[in-house]
């Protein structure tokens, strides 16, 4: 018995140092390696290489204390290369205070700067971000309109649904996706009624989120109407959408809607009497 204990002790004595060496060290706090004073000087230096290196360091650290420094840079203005990086870093930090500094850039002359600004506003959030994205929907840049629509959906900007309907006929599929996430009541019925009037490829991104929403904002009658219209289409795309909806239908959803989807996939007519 004593010999066995001695062997176990010897094994543990050999393993513990190795385990201690293999164990990962505790990660330092994100702001530990970021010197705000030196970072501020680099951002104000006017030297492109130093400025870009400082922005890289800020993003790597994830230190929200640096957000005002990036905001100040955006307010001062810079070359397109620096602006792109600064806007992206501000978005990565995700501070609502940064939205005011980013917002003007959705109207920048360079398309890439405009789209990067719209992407970052979806992360910095707030009323300023929502207003800027709604303004971006009215622009002439199709890619910017799509990015703005995505951002409004991500931000839960329900007041923007009327604006999204305006750009939907301009073949902005991202607007359909956002409407499917945000619509309520008659807005959802209006959206479903557009099936067949607008190209399916434009509309389809909004159908799945609409069918899978569990709150009372989306009328079940609108869901049943959509299910029946998709059944009547009898296309591969429509059937695939219904199959995806059935496979991912939430447990908290109305079981009658789930049953209606299943019935439609089997070729059975779906009516409001299903409720």
Listing of model-derived features with the role each one plays in the protein:
Residues 23-31, 41, 49-63, 72-73, ...:
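Structural detector for internal amphipathic alpha-helices that build alpha-solenoid repeat scaffolds
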Residues 36-37:
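Immediate post-signal-peptide N-terminus of mature secreted/exported proteins
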Residues 1-4:
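Positively charged n-region of N-terminal signal peptides that target proteins for export
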Residues 6-17:
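Bacterial N-terminal signal peptides
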């Amino acid at each position: 018995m004593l010999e066995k204990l001695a062997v176990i002790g010897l094994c543990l004595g050999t393993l513990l140092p190795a385990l201690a060496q293999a164990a990962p060290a505790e990660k330092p706090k994100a702001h530990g390696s970021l010197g705000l004073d030196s970072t501020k000087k680099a951002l104000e230096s006017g030297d492109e290489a130093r400025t870009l290196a400082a922005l890289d360091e800020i993003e790597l650290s994830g230190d929200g204390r640096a957000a005002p420094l990036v905001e100040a840079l955006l307010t001062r203005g810079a070359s397109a290369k620096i602006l792109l990086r600064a806007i992206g870093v501000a978005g990565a930090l995700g501070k609502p205070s940064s939205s005011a500094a980013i917002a003007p850039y959705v109207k920048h002359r360079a398309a890439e700067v405009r789209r990067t600004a719209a992407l970052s506003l979806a992360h910095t959030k707030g009323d300023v971000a929502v207003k800027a994205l709604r303004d971006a929907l009215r622009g002439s840049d199709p890619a910017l309109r799509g990015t703005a629509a995505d951002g409004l959906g991500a931000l839960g900007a329900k007041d923007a649904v009327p604006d999204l309907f305006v750009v939907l006929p301009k073949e902005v599929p991202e607007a359909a996706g956002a409407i499917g996430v945000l619509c309520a009541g008659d807005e959802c019925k209006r959206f479903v009624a557009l099936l067949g009037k607008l190209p399916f490829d434009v509309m389809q991104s909004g159908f799945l989120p609409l069918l899978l929403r569990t709150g009372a904002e989306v009328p079940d009658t609108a869901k049943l109407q959509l299910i029946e219209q998709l059944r009547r289409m009898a296309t591969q795309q429509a059937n695939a959408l219904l199959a995806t909806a059935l496979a991912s239908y939430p447990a908290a959803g109305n079981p009658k809607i789930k049953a209606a989807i299943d019935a439609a996939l089997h070729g059975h007519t779906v009516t409001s009497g299903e409720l």
